[in-house]
């Protein structure tokens, strides 16, 4: 509207993103400034004919508000839910019965393999209980959590938990890198599909002014 137009601009356009609760968040703006600011600051350019002309300028962009948009679009009551592509930590490894022989070593080896494949991974070797760690990393929105304990190592498997659906699935340790990569790709796609579905379910087409 005229009241929302950037002061001094000829026209202002905005991009409104729909959040999880159906509310909108202004995620980007584009202002056509015409020659108003160029005249004020004496901004000129040389035309093809050789003369000086006053420039037509714009101002546009997105900002840190997109971080808020991501949180509000995907987050839930448990905390953050980051899409894997932008997650600071894509995968966290939580040792189970960490003091048992070979557990930490197996977790460190898995971490090294995942890092070698370009996956952003953290090994939580703190003294907190597994339950505490689960809640903490869920709150931080890490897309995939790997639980690895003595029984898992003996069986040659690992338990992977998705942050977006909280679903748990067993995967073979032998193909850990490929399995985690595939799971991250699935989480990324499913989160995008879910966000689009929520958006589309709230779109109403108005063909006339009635009602």
Can you name each region flagged by the protein language model?
Residues 1-211:
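NTP/phosphate- and nucleic-acid-binding module
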């Amino acid at each position: 509207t005229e009241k929302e137009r950037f002061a001094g601009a000829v026209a202002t356009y905005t991009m409104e993103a729909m959040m999880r609760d159906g509310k909108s968040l202004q995620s980007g703006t584009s202002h056509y400034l015409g020659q108003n600011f160029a005249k004020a600051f004496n901004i000129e350019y040389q035309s093809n004919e050789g003369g000086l002309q006053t420039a037509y300028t714009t101002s546009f962009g997105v900002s840190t508000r997109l971080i808020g948009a991501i949180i509000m679009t995907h987050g839930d009551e448990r905390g953050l839910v980051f899409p894997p592509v932008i997650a600071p930590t894509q995968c966290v490894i939580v040792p189970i019965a960490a003091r048992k022989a070979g557990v930490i070593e197996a977790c460190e080896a898995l971490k090294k393999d995942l890092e070698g494949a370009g996956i952003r991974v953290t090994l939580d070797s703190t003294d907190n209980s597994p339950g505490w760690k689960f809640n903490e990393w869920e709150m931080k929105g890490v897309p995939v959590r790997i639980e690895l304990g003595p029984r898992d190592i003996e069986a040659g498997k690992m338990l992977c938990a998705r942050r977006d659906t909280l679903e748990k699935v067993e995967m073979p340790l032998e193909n850990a890198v490929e399995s985690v990569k595939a799971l991250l790709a699935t989480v990324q796609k499913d989160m995008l599909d879910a966000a689009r579905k929520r958006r589309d379910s709230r779109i109403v087409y108005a063909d006339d002014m009635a009602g």
